[in-house]
Amino acid sequence: MTNIITRFAPSPTGFLHIGSARTALFNYLFARHNNGKFFLRIEDTDKKRSTKEAIAAIFSGLKWLGINWDGEVIFQSKRNSLYKEAALKLLKEGKAYYCFTKQEEIARQRQQALKDKKHFIFNSEWRDKGPSTYPADIKPVIRLKVPREGSITIHDTLQGDIVIENSHIDDMILIRADGTATYMLAVIVDDHDMGITHIIRGDDHLTNAARQIAIYHAFGYEVPNMTHIPLIHGADGTKLSKRHGALGVEAYKDMGYLPESLCNYLLRLGWSHGDDEIISMNQAIEWFNLDSLGKSPSKLDFAKMNSINSHYLRMLDNDSLTSKTVAILKQNYKISEKEVSYIKQAMPSLIVRSATLIDLAQLAYIYLVDSPMIYNQDAKEVIKNCDKDLIKQIIANLNKLEQFDKECIQNKFKEIAIYNGLKLNDIMRPVRALITGMTASPSIFEIAETLGKENILKRLNIIYYNLNF
């Protein structure tokens, strides 16, 4: 079998899109499964839209996900001389031609076809003209001379064979008037030079496939195996957009998802291995194949993503969870060693209530005794409407406790509830709001034991102040 070589070839015009990350993952897994190579190419021929920040985002996003490429990164912007050389070769062989038609004329013809309700294919008057007719005052483009007769067949692993008549394919531009190569030419020259054997990409590229194959044929290059995968859709079944939630990999990192979890989730968006839901990277490399790709678009499901992330969070040990949680909190707060120890001690009760690292950090804020309390809106309402005399009674009783462990604290609250003819939950609701700033949290008795009497009384004593909620 030929040595498998795949590639990921993003345009650096923005963040690393979640759909692009899945494409990179599939190419990476297919190469690794077959002991092949996986290359990274930056398609930065569009100088106006390509940015250094976007390139950095691609690099950091892939590295964070654990998708490591082989060899040096290829930059198309550094290869324009090779593209021009390739185009001139086609010119010499009569497979391409100089076209001097102005863009205004092409636009006029397109508008006329639209008016006549006809499909527009530009037919250049320069296709078969010689140098003696070339105008001296116009910079030409170089166009591919696509055969007028016959057809092109796209042999797609997933979509099957798709036949496109040559009459439906335009003489596409290979070199622009300014001397730069178009995407269509650059991608074919690069894939050939890099020895790419398999192309796995979104089915939005399917419309380009026949045009690209026409260029492959013109050069006499072998066409790589093509697999066009359905795009990721939003929960409503429409094409993924900003209204469906985060689109960039960096955003998912900031939302507290683990890279292993996100890879697992993306893998299952369009690929399956029986009923397996939790699949490690090593398992994915062992099992990945093109036969198990799905033909229908997958829908982005945050509930499923959270479920998978919860699983991976629970696989981490206490030290690792504490370290990751504290790192997030330190972005905004100064944290003492004492507070770190509180968080570490409380971690078992925090992790079971968290789907992401951000969830963990928000709950862990309860244990930042040296930072101002933050009360959510529900907690504010509970505190505003609570029986302040009851809270003062609770403060007095807790202050007298000599042993401040969760069992003693719980028993004391039960006594207070019985004394006041109340249910335990009735008195715990305002206490929880005052101690945690929330109306739902881990066990108050465990929190109290961890933080100690002094910190708990300090938080309850806020009831004495004129709260401006």
UniProtKB/Swiss-Prot annotation:
Organism whose genome encodes this protein: Rickettsia typhi (strain ATCC VR-144 / Wilmington)
Assembly notes: Monomer.
Subcellular location(s) of the protein: Cytoplasm
UniProt short sequence motif 'KMSKS' region, positions renumbered to this chain: 239-243
Reactions catalysed according to its record: tRNA(Glu) + L-glutamate + ATP = L-glutamyl-tRNA(Glu) + AMP + diphosphate
UniProt motif 'HIGH' region: location: 10-20
Descriptive protein name: Glutamate--tRNA ligase 2
InterPro entries, alphabetized: aa-tRNA-synth_I_cd-bd (IPR045462), aa-tRNA-synth_I_codon-bd_sub2 (IPR020751), aa_tRNA-synth_I_cd-bd_sf (IPR008925), Glu-tRNA-ligase_bac/mito (IPR004527), Glu/Gln-tRNA-synth (IPR000924), Glu/Gln-tRNA-synth_Ib_cat-dom (IPR020058), GluQ/Sye (IPR049940), GluRS_core (IPR033910)
PANTHER family: GLUTAMATE--TRNA LIGASE, GLUTAMATE--TRNA LIGASE, MITOCHONDRIAL-RELATED
Family that this chain belongs to: Belongs to the class-I aminoacyl-tRNA synthetase family. Glutamate--tRNA ligase type 1 subfamily.
Organism lineage string: Bacteria, Pseudomonadati, Pseudomonadota, Alphaproteobacteria, Rickettsiales
Keywords (A to Z) from UniProt: Aminoacyl-tRNA synthetase, ATP-binding, Cytoplasm, Ligase, Nucleotide-binding, Protein biosynthesis
Originating gene: gltX2
Role, per record: Catalyzes the attachment of glutamate to tRNA(Glu) in a two-step reaction: glutamate is first activated by ATP to form Glu-AMP and then transferred to the acceptor end of tRNA(Glu).
Broad enzyme group: ligase
